[in-house]
A protein has these predicted regions:
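Hydrophobic/aromatic residues positioned on beta-strands within the core alpha/beta folds
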Residues: 80-81
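Acidic catalytic/metal-coordinating carboxylates
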Residues: 31-35, 58-64
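Alpha4 helix (beta4-alpha4-beta5 surface) of REC/receiver domains from two-component response regulators
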Residues: 61, 84-100, 110-113
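A Lys-centered signature of the CheY-like receiver
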Residues: 104
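Acidic, metal-coordinating helix/loop segments flanking the phosphotransfer/catalytic sites
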Residues: 29-47
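The feature encodes the CheY-like receiver
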Residues: 13, 55, 85
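Active-site residues of response regulator receiver
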Residues: 51
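Two-component/phosphorelay signaling modules centered on CheY-like receiver
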Residues: 10-28, 95-96
Length: 115
């Protein structure tokens, strides 16, 4: 599976990308939302794992861009965030086209099963 991981926390991206690579997935990492969008525009991914709370161009900004350009419903998006989301926030993300919302920290095998 070809996976794009967008998260500003380099410790998290290192652990997750190493785990997913060992499990046989091809994992591309972006520590910035805008750079993540550039990857999306130039490469076809099976899944995007996206953090919401990033400095500058946030995960919400990435979702807005994908929605405005008709890409949100075409991509499998898994939100992985430490942010405290209400049930309504989670429902709204799912209604927009996000496939799964997961809370950090999460066991890596559970994350992989969600892909």
């Amino acid at each position: 599976m070809k996976i794009l991981l967008i998260d500003d926390n380099q410790s998290i991206t290192k652990v997750i990308s190493q785990y997913l690579t060992v499990q046989g997935h091809e994992c591309t990492v972006s520590n910035d939302g805008k750079i993540g969008l550039a990857f999306i525009q130039n490469t076809k991914f099976d899944v995007i794992i996206l953090d919401l709370a990033m400095p500058g161009f946030t995960g919400f900004d990435v979702l807005d861009y994908l929605e405005e350009n008709g890409l949100l419903k075409k991509l499998k998006i898994v939100i992985l965030t430490a942010a405290e989301l209400s049930e309504k926030d989670t429902e709204n993300l799912l209604k927009r086209g996000v496939n799964k919302v997961l809370k950090k920290p999460i066991p890596l095998n559970i994350l992989e099963e969600s892909l």
